[in-house]
A protein has these predicted regions:
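Polytopic transmembrane helical bundles with strong interfacial aromatic enrichment
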Residues: 1-152
C-alpha cells in the first residue's frame, strides 16, 4: 500500500471518527444531560453546540469526500467491489442528510432562539435529533461494511 493511500485512509477514518463520534456523543451523552433544563437554557446551548459541531462536520465531509473519491479510484473506480460502492452511496446519503440539517434545520433553530420562540426551536431540534439518529445508524452500517470488506 503506497504512502498516498495510507495518508488518505488515515484522513478518511479521522473524518469518520469525528462525525460519527460527535453524533454519538451528542445523542447519547449531551442530549440526556440537557433534558432537565428549561427550553430557555437548553435551546441556546443546542444552538451553540450545533454551530461548533457543524463546522467540524463540514470539514470532515469535505475530507471524507476527497479521500473517499481518491481511495475509490485507487481500488478500481467503477469496477471496485460492491462494499466500496455501498460505502460511497451510504456516505453520500449521509452527506445529503447533513446538508439538510445544516442548511435547512439549523437556521430554524437559530431563528427560533434569537426570537425566543421556544416551541419552534424545540420542534427543529427534535427533527435534527431524529435525523442524527438516522445518520448514526447509517454511519455504523457503513463502518460494518468497511470491516467486512477487509477480508480478515
Amino acid at each position: 500500500m503506497g504512502h498516498a493511500i495510507v495518508v488518505a485512509l488515515f484522513l478518511h477514518l479521522l473524518g469518520v471518527a469525528i462525525w460519527i463520534g460527535g453524533m454519538i456523543f451528542a445523542h447519547f451523552c449531551l442530549r440526556p444531560a440537557l433534558e432537565d433544563l428549561s427550553p430557555q437554557l437548553r435551546l441556546p446551548l443546542w444552538e451553540s453546540v450545533f454551530g461548533r459541531f457543524f463546522n467540524w462536520v463540514g470539514v470532515s465531509v469535505i475530507v471524507i469526500l476527497l479521500t473517499g473519491g481518491f481511495l475509490l479510484m485507487q481500488f478500481g473506480g467503477g469496477h471496485a467491489s460492491w462494499p466500496l460502492h455501498a460505502m460511497a452511496g451510504i456516505g453520500v446519503l449521509m452527506m445529503l442528510i447533513f446538508g439538510h440539517i445544516r442548511f435547512a434545520l439549523f437556521p430554524r433553530v437559530r431563528r427560533a432562539v434569537q426570537a425566543q420562540r421556544w416551541p419552534d426551536g424545540a420542534r427543529a431540534v427534535g427533527t435534527v435529533r431524529r435525523l442524527v439518529v438516522v445518520n448514526t445508524v447509517l454511519g455504523i452500517v457503513t463502518i460494518g461494511v468497511a470491516v467486512m470488506s477487509r477480508g480478515f
